[in-house]
Amino acid sequence: MNSPELVIVSDTPYTVIDQPTEWISVSKDIQLAARLWRPDITVPVPVVVEIIPYRRQDGTLPIDERMHPYWAGHGVATLRVDLRGCGDSDGILEDEYLKLEQDDAIAVIKWAEKQPWCNGNVGMTGLSWGGFASLQVAARRPKALKAIIAIGATVDRYNDDVHYKNGCLLNENFGWGTSLTAFTSRPPDPSVVGKKWRSMWLNRLENLKFFAAEWFQHQTRDDYWKHGSICENFDAIEIPVMIISGWNDLYVNALPALMDNLKGRCHAVCGPWAHHFPHLGTPGPSYDYLGSSLAWWRQWLSDEPARLGTEKTHLTFIKDSSMPNPFVMTVAGRWIDDQTWPLPSNTMSHLYMAKAGLTSKAVDAPPVQIHSPVDTGAMAGEWVPHCSGAEVAGCQRLTDAQSTCFDGDILDQAIDVFGCPEITISLQSNSTTGHLIVRLCDVAPSGSSELISIGVLNLTHRNGNENPIPMPVGETQSLQLRLDYAGHRFLPGHKIRIALSTAYWPFIWPAVENPVLTLAKKPACLSLPGRQKQEEGSVQVNPPIAPPASALTEKRVPQSKRQVTHDMHQGKTSLTIRDDLGEVVFEAHGLVTSAVKYESYEITAGDPLSSQARFGWEFEYSRDDWAVRTVTETQLMCDHYYYFLTATVRAYEQGKQVFERTFDHKIARMC
């Protein structure tokens, strides 16, 4: 499902040589499998590397073929590499973002620069994992790496990824841990690795990691999370960085962080899309990402690259107020092209929580309480939505009704919010633990409520994420919380709303207790960054382009279901999700793949310790008389003191079970 504005382009200046498998030795006994696209010319050209764990033969092939051939056809070679232990590559995947992974990437870069078709200049790119890796490897400074493009990435693995956020345990920590375990249970392709496919597969299964269990061992911002977090030393990156995200993506905060802290050239782009490449993402509108990225590669990877500078530029889509619709394919707004950073015309407005709502007058907050039902947030969508649809946050009215809300006056003129909103608040708690969730919403005249930004805090992390401190019961504590990066125009007739809650389930695993928080008689302030000259820098952008879609035959149509149910007798709320990703035949090599993911969450009213989560994946691969299947099932439960994690992985060949392993972990909880 792509943006309706996407333009298909087939012609390129150069014929492309497509080499489906190139073997790259990164150590004595480990070879990584790669796909190489390069222009059919005799002149050496630059090369861009993307190294990720998602299987180039099938997993990302439909995306790869709508990006890499375009660059190659315009004179920039590309390598799409399977990570160690993934796809057709040798070895075992031990964890995310290890130094070993970075070493492998550096070895690939060194290999690439020495090829006769390469001019010695290498770029690195990727979405999500590949974006993280690009930033991390750039900080290692391999000589041949001259520029990167990171999409949907983070500079802080603890606070701005899927694991934790300000001390709050994200349910995606367990969900993504399940997915990564399931992903690494899959076999290599016999058509690529030959007869050793089975021994490689069984070796992977026997050494399989239950990644979530490791991540649950690190509930504070310790050295585990500091490794690979670029924010620990921004100065380590000296090459030009293009950083891209979307307002409907989790990974927006890397943009201002890199723009504010890198000493060298940085270009940031933020549009309305979710967690995807911008030319393929929704909702739109998007821009010509492939043309823009090609110009970036040419600028920094040519035989005579541009002079390194310190310029900071930012292309931003400022979205207009609209009726919340998760399924919309394009939204209203305008593109802004800022050629300086920070913006000289930035403003900061302040609104205070008062008995009548939000006011510009600095007054003490009323002594209202914040105490939300434990299932507050059940209709909120996904933490990391990938496209338009039920994953994207919809109307917030139901969640607002379970929260303590403060509304501003009806606006008589438009107000732009651009930057990271902040809230300063003083409160008391009746518990030593708990969460505070703050949402910034746009309320339309009809009463619909649109989510603009969110901030979350484990109250024991109010003084930092490394050494939690229990909340003192009944004592006033002053807090400052930064919300996520936002770009939004509140239109006349709308209202600004701040919504406060103590729960946001199932996004956030409940704290041990669901506290009653009471605002103290002190000013509670919402600070909104904006633009003084709202129309300054408005531009028209070229529409997104992409090569034609891959040759696939659909045998089973993808289908997604998402249901929230309330058991009135037991007081139980359940969320069930089933994502059938369909069954397809890859015409290029005949592989048939099928994938189904399912999730379920439940919680009982008034009992935060009743929260449960179950996840599962089923993968099937076949070709001719070869057929394999893997099934992964996991469960998360808790009590006052521990998390209980279980997982079972089964593997089948020709319908016969050939492997089974069960994991069972009891982990002391700190959050």
Please provide the spans of the model-predicted regions.
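Accessory cap/linker subdomain of secreted extracellular hydrolases
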Residues: 64-65, 73, 139-236
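Short beta-strand/loop motif that positions the catalytic acidic residue
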Residues: 237, 243-245
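N-terminal cap/lid segment of alpha/beta-hydrolase-fold proteins
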Residues: 4-42, 407, 411-413
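C-terminal, loop-rich substrate-recognition/catalytic regions characterized by aromatic stacking residues
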Residues: 4-6, 283-652, 656-671
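Alpha/beta-hydrolase fold nucleophile elbow
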Residues: 116-128
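Glycine-rich nucleophile elbow surrounding the catalytic serine of serine-hydrolase chemistry
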Residues: 126-136
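Cap/lid segment of the alpha/beta-hydrolase catalytic domain
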Residues: 40-113, 162, 441-446
